[in-house]
Amino acid sequence: MAFRSVGTNLSRPYTDGVGGLAEDLEALKSAGPDFVEVWPQNLGVILGGSLDANRLRTVGELLLEAELAYTVHVPLEVNLMDLSTHGLQRDVLNSSLRFAKDIGAEVVVCHAGQRVAARDARHSMEVQLSAERSALREAGDLAGELGVTIAVENYYPERPIVRGAIYDYSVWPSQLAEQIFAVEHPAVGICLDVGHAALAAGFFGFDFIEECGATASLVRHVHLHDNLQRTNVTGEPQASEHTVYGLGDLHLPPGRGTIPLEDLLRRMEFPENPSCCVELSAELFSLVPEALHAAREISLVVAAREPVSL
């Protein structure tokens, strides 16, 4: 198979108690994922940058009782290029790594840093990128001690990026690869988000497969989901409105959109088969069985065919 394991995500919030968590874990377990990707911010296990011991005990017991394997997705707001709160950003990442260790997760996904125009104007881009590299090396040391791999994820052109209020170098997967190559740490790799890359290719006009191919040797984890490759430039926040027009990061099951997933994966020369999280929007929770089946079918088809060089 193209992937060593195929799982899915649990992105619903459970910060007000734990009502529904055990039931949702059981529903996911019945769908047969190899793992479930959980978000510490949605489980309420981090408070002020540190693990909340009481909350961790409650949530951790439920996660372990479900007898599932896990990966972890760091809070979305973690930004290792934010020099104004750099210590706190590193604390949240490190707490996420320790949370992963507690629940037996081997992969921790972290978004690449972003430059916020108004806040970061007094810092050069290179200073910010250097700060991110240093933070990732430091976190990589901790990850290595804990037996965890950090996978840094590429992003997509959401509205603040399109407007120029935020600059995110990782919308070009090849630039993310350059940064992670420069980090040069065995516990730090890339999470290739295929849906994000497809949206970025459609908006910026780069070659989708070529850009993704630049990351292949560093990919440790994949976020696999589908969309219609149409950037959302409207101000409408409701996901239901985006779906009607097929806009933005829809997080559909593989095959429901227009991304050439099979073609891409046939051209990706992974040095080792990465884990694959079929990352669906919370509104599509009921489609997890379909999504897992589709991802496994793609993986089998790709593995059965001769790879195609880029």
Question: Which residues are covered by each model-predicted region?
Answer:
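N-terminal pre-domain/capping segments
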Residues: 1-105, 189-191, 296-310
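Histidine-acidic metal/acid-base catalytic patches
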Residues: 1-5, 14, 18-30, 106, ...
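Active-site-proximal loop/turn and secondary-structure-junction residues that shape catalytic pockets
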Residues: 12-14, 40-44, 76-78, 112-116, ...
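Flexible, glycine- and charge-enriched loops at secondary-structure boundaries
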Residues: 21, 49-52, 86, 90, ...
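Hydrophobic residues within beta-strands of alpha/beta enzymes
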Residues: 36-38, 108, 150, 222, ...
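Active-site acidic/histidine proton-transfer and metal-coordination neighborhood
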Residues: 62-65, 82-189
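Short, basic/glycine-rich phosphate-binding loops at helix/coil junctions
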Residues: 70, 156-157, 241-246
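Hydrophobic residues in well-ordered beta-strands that form the structural core
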Residues: 72, 150-152, 192, 278
